[in-house]
């Protein structure tokens, strides 16, 4: 779909080759973790308390929009606890045996990180309950009348679950997490610090004003900020001498069709469709998806959250409505 081509899509498979670079510039410790002050302060206390008691950290659920650093935070927790981390995702764990294999290979106080935990199958989820509560694994041996259940003791461990859809988790699973952290969109100042740190890690010559220009257009999302930084770097190396100032960053981002608000053509297409085709709304999700040629899930999970958070779009019981701010942005009269 169109989503796969978006430079500012928080989750874009076209850029997976750059994950190696992303891992290299990710912070490893809480002290280097920019933004999300409330999360950082709380996790520092929880981690130190667990270390003082020589216990595994309580199970942790991290949720929020894509690209805000859920995986980064999970790795930071493991680094701070000085334990191993094993990483998987909900869709990968198709059978109970897949989860059992991971759990039985954990060492004491290790971290098991499950991304997209809301996509766990009910069968796998059932196995997870006693593992989280009692550090025990219930396994069925054999089939039919001869089948029997055996219990395997597990070492104390920390399950970290990450999701963009906390509401999709079942109540029994959600209630078993002792710590819940929501990641919010980042402030521009925090994103500027992230961009500057990434530039330093990549050995780039970048002025603070250049980092600020990238941060302003990154939709409050570190993953997008780092992706834009790499494209600005390309522009600076080809069109200039490699040095990134505000003017170079502005020209590069304009060339990439990312405007001052961080909108790309899909954001503009969505808002303009509501204003021009549906009289500003309200318009239902099905009609909007058909009008712009995009999947409903992509509209709900990727396009809309930032537009709503910035005050350009409203969700109402009757449908989506373009706000006065959207009309002002495009210079269109209501």
Curated annotation (Swiss-Prot):
Gene3D superfamilies: 1.10.8.60, P-loop containing nucleotide triphosphate hydrolases, Winged helix-like DNA-binding domain superfamily/Winged helix DNA-binding domain. Residues 260-334 are annotated as: Head domain (RuvB-H). InterPro entries: AAA+_ATPase, AAA_lid_4, DNA_helicase_Holl-junc_RuvB, P-loop_NTPase, RuvB-like_N, RuvB_C, WH-like_DNA-bd_sf, WH_DNA-bd_sf. CDD domains: AAA (cd00009). It holds the Pfam family RuvB_N. SUPFAM superfamilies: P-loop containing nucleoside triphosphate hydrolases, Winged helix' DNA-binding domain. Mg(2+) binds at residue 71. It is an enzyme of class 3 (hydrolase). The keyword Cell membrane does not apply. Residues 4-186 are annotated as: Large ATPase domain (RuvB-L). Has 3 domains, the large (RuvB-L) and small ATPase (RuvB-S) domains and the C-terminal head (RuvB-H) domain. The head domain binds DNA, while the ATPase domains jointly bind ATP, ADP or are empty depending on the state of the subunit in the translocation cycle. During a single DNA translocation step the structure of each domain remains the same, but their relative positions change. This is Holliday junction branch migration complex subunit RuvB.
